[in-house]
């Protein structure tokens, strides 16, 4: 027999298979649809604690067993009384009585009773209709705004249907009548109403005995009674009535007292409440430091307990979570915080009054009403957020997040035993064995240093020494996120190679694969930084290891060597620091007679030199130790001062000393440790976030004469940081912050110096070739790529880059599309100096500049002296240790006008940021705050055409931004439709036929799905961006220089955005430009903060005017000397012609010594000419034979007269006059230059112009 025949053994009839029930029957047959499950459920619920002591919580979270359907019919009657309290002003008393023995429940309230009258349309008493007829209600008017709980016409009738007895008693005082009616047998049987006269006050009382059999119960158990009693306390809080339970008044009748029932004042819980900001919203947040409670939402809507929350909770919680997240991100920037991580630490109370609320089901556990239609809006206050922050929850959230993330770091732990293999790792033979702790891992700065170490291993062997190269600098782990640390390949490699376990406290080193780390890095500031980063890594995660002296070591390789002699008499002196070399030079005739070789990188050494270094390993090994005892830092850091150097050439290190200007934002030059353990303090000072101001003071203490003694082989971490690592921080600032006088950072100055020396005004040169020339000539040590980027940046001229580019961009040097990131490779680019540079940097000034020296070579000046402050012409930005700077450029014409005002003792006029070819506007907000506003035109009602963006907003980025807005807007609009549809579906989950049958929706069949869909929809809608949802589409017609975006909005949305003031900010059509971080090195080499453009200009003019005087004095002296030389040359030639000086006698030339003796006898003076070091007669002896003529005499006399006239003209001019003349010459050249630049720009802008838009009705740069 088939399965089919078996299943149809007793087939149902058609009538049995297809049934029709009326609504009354359906409610009893399908309780889940109306009141929820009628079976017992065991779960945690908030209930009243009958056994609570005076200081104990009265409402507790406890596991109970109850029947949801029974709870719901009870709740319907409770909400019915609450609704009456809202409707009727005279309803101010509600009494709830529960007899646990009989199971009888009654709810009484005063106030207006129900109309005791017969309904004319339906011919039935009104109380009978309301409580005994299904789908009857006073809440069907959709045009009326109601803030009650009832709405669907079921309400207390559900309690009637699920009761064995249900009575309604009400008094209509207006008619002087009292109504009483009794229902039994699940509302199937009803007695005739009893109407009597009654002269006292109105009231309504509902009494019922649930049908316990239908709920599988015999009576009201303790759990259910505790749950019902808690609900009465809810009623006391959510209404303004006096509420009684079993004749005892509940005094905890306000929001604060109600929350106190859960979390009394004596508990450890931290409570923050806002019940006054908005009359329709009461909000509380509880932080549980004991971490015993899970995240909870205890919420109410119009006295209904929304146990699953809803959109009202999401609106409140979302704001609070966002506020806390902002605070947390500020405090711990690198910790990844998700909203759920914040919520899990908090309990939220929300009591909201919502107009015409919508719920997902008849059980009304979850509000689905759209937030926009609440009838009110709760906005969390800053005070409230601060109150929550004060509870300490943010620290807990950060700690939890770090604990989670750090747990992931354990996945990258190393092991003390066994092999570890990495591509570039050369393990010690004993590593990972029982003798592993005796091994040393040599961490090298790159592959070249690895080769140096491998050469050295030929000397010391491989048994106890392993080598692993680092790729650049190690990550600063102290403030990095655990995820970033876990993803860092080098951090992971070191952990596995050494055998380090995350968080382990090491009592000894025997469990490690390597018992020490040796750092092999270049002897320069970047090498110091690498050492510090490795120390920081170990100290941050394994502070116990740095307490072992020598766990971290470094190899002191030579920075330079002085060599003298050859063979057996050869002498070699090695130096590991520039300071020790300078000290040696002082004692050894400035190094004369010695050959000096500089080792800027370990790759400079050949294998023999590497082996030589390792042969004397112990003498070159520096071991670091922990020094907790406090030192007198003040006397140590300020023990020496640097003498001023007035010579034209000075050592670079001298320029760095004490460079923080007394007028800067932080002026202290004494750093005092914040931690009693000075080594601990030094570590966090150098690497930890939050100590930026301390680092500024620390940098200010720098003294180049306070350096590590190279003879010491034991150095404390404290001394390393304060004497060696500090030089990296100082150098970092020097590289990042430009000089007031020329607007150059060191790399820019080197490029300009090399370009002038190469004289590339006429002949263009490849950028890659110029990079090599500049690097070699100026001793640049930070890589060709960095220098090439500097050259490219100096030649860029797109909007937002240079206002006046000194180098010409001959090739694709980058555009406004990406902010210059789209430049071609340096090997494809050519450049040359713009002729206008000659009018800015005057040749006469080059001889008075103070040059630096390095490797015993003269390099670029400390700063140049342009005739206008190029820092204001082109602006600058940079970030260094402790200091950053951001200076926006100005119009050169405004700058020149103000210089001339200052030269005549007038006050300069206020300048504002200016960018060449920017067509948008720069507007002053207040003080030092400006904004850059885009230029756009409004076309019709729903379209704007953007023709320029705020400066610094690049075209590609803006296009991506608009693409993202379109995607967001499409999603938001779809979600809103989906939400609207979901709400509509929730309202119509039951469709009633004439016979009363109903059909459930898909979500009704799957309540979990309904709950999930509602939550996801409302969450997304709550985050909607009004600008994104307003945009319909956009198009663009941009090029590398042209901006052209046309944005079309949905009808009416553009006008709304303009009126609300959200258009410009929402579309990023404005960008702030603040003049609040203008740091510069001044003429003394000290960093100074300037508050205004005027302050920069005044400082520049003061110094530049002195330099004009210095130049004048120098030229007068130089020209007088040149006149003297011309005069004595004339006299010499005349003496030769006259025979007073005899060069030839008897057909033979006289000896040079005889001629020089004759010059001395005739009192001819000696002069220093050209590159000569001492005065001599070179100016005479260099005269050629054919210049000993009368024609040459006349020529020299003419030169002498011209020079005399030139000198007289210069003597007659003041420095101010000289400057003004040069400014005028510059303006004349600048006019020509600017005209050509503008013509070229406009030609490119208008060439092959794209499609034209409609004519605008209104053009504006919107405010």
Curated annotation (Swiss-Prot):
The record's remark on the cofactor is:
Binds two Mg(2+) per subunit. The magnesium ions form salt bridges with both the protein and the DNA. Can also accept other divalent metal cations, such as Mn(2+) or Ca(2+).
EC number(s) per entry: 5.6.2.2
What molecular function terms (GO) are annotated for this protein?
ATP binding; DNA binding; DNA topoisomerase type II (double strand cut, ATP-hydrolyzing) activity; metal ion binding
Q: Which EC class does it fall in?
A: isomerase
Q: What does the entry list as the binding residues for ATP?
A: 80, 109, 137-139, 150-157, 362-364
What keyword terms does UniProt attach to this protein?
ATP-binding, DNA-binding, Isomerase, Magnesium, Metal-binding, Nucleotide-binding, Topoisomerase
Site positions (Transition state stabilizer): 827
The source's domain of life comes to Viruses
Entry cofactors: Mg(2+); Mn(2+); Ca(2+)
Q: Site: Interaction with DNA. Where?
A: 473, 476, 695-696, 745, 780, 786, 954
Please list the residues that make up the active site: 828
Which biological process, per GO, is one annotated for this protein?
Answer: sister chromatid segregation
List residues of the Toprim domain. 439-553
Please list the residues that bind Mg(2+) 2. 522, 524
Instruction: Provide the catalytic activity annotation.
Output: ATP-dependent breakage, passage and rejoining of double-stranded DNA
**Biased-composition ranges for Low complexity?**
981-1000
The protein's job, in short, is: Can introduce negative superhelical turns into double-stranded circular DNA.
Entry protein name: DNA topoisomerase 2
Q: Which organism is it from?
A: Acanthamoeba polyphaga mimivirus (APMV)
UniProt lineage? Viruses, Varidnaviria, Bamfordvirae, Nucleocytoviricota, Megaviricetes
